[in-house]
Amino acid sequence: FSSVPVHWHEEMEFIVVKKGRGLVTLDRESRLLEAGQAVIVLPGQLHGIRQYQQERMEYENIIFRLEMLLPKEGDVCGPKFLEPYRDGKLLYPAWIDGSALYHEEMLECIRKMDELSEQRPRGYPLAVKGWLFQFFFLMFSRVEPTLAEEGREKSLDKMKRILRRIEVDYGKPLSIEEMAEFSGFSESHFMKFFKNHMGVPFVSYLNDYRLTLAARALAEGQEDVLTVAMDVG
């Protein structure tokens, strides 16, 4: 792969590197991750993956809704631990890179879930949930959380609106002038805002996004080159 453009979704995600190395972006921070390392992506968090130089990387995504661990009533796990974490009110380290002793224990939880999902023994969803609870127990019990910064959420929400507009209208001409007006910024402020959040200029991101979708469509072989080119603008 060359890249997975920065995007967001409502599900939680673990990105786990299996082989090689690659650059992973989480909100405004990018890190070089290698085999045996991972990152935790919260619902609504901006994230993406890029190739590092000419190196190859194999990774897997574990995507799930945290609500599967939240009972409707009569349980302290949700309101005391999981909900504040999901909503970004309490911040825990997202990078599982071996810098802490408990990282290996957390990666072992991911490996166990991976094995269960491949083998699928009877009742395996129960065990998967059990390992998810163990994963979060390790994190909550070993790390003191920090409070979210004021103003950070508004900035990220605006960036997510911009990305959603690109996802919907990438096949149309999208000018800096139009996107600046959509965002409520001047053109110069929009360009600065976008690059500060994404690490690349708007036009570069839009072109990369279109190329990524075109490559995916061609790989699936459902349409010819001309049709794909017209679809992605």
Which functions belong to the PLM regions below?
Residues 1-38, 45, 53, 77-80, ...:
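Generic protein-terminus/edge-of-domain signal
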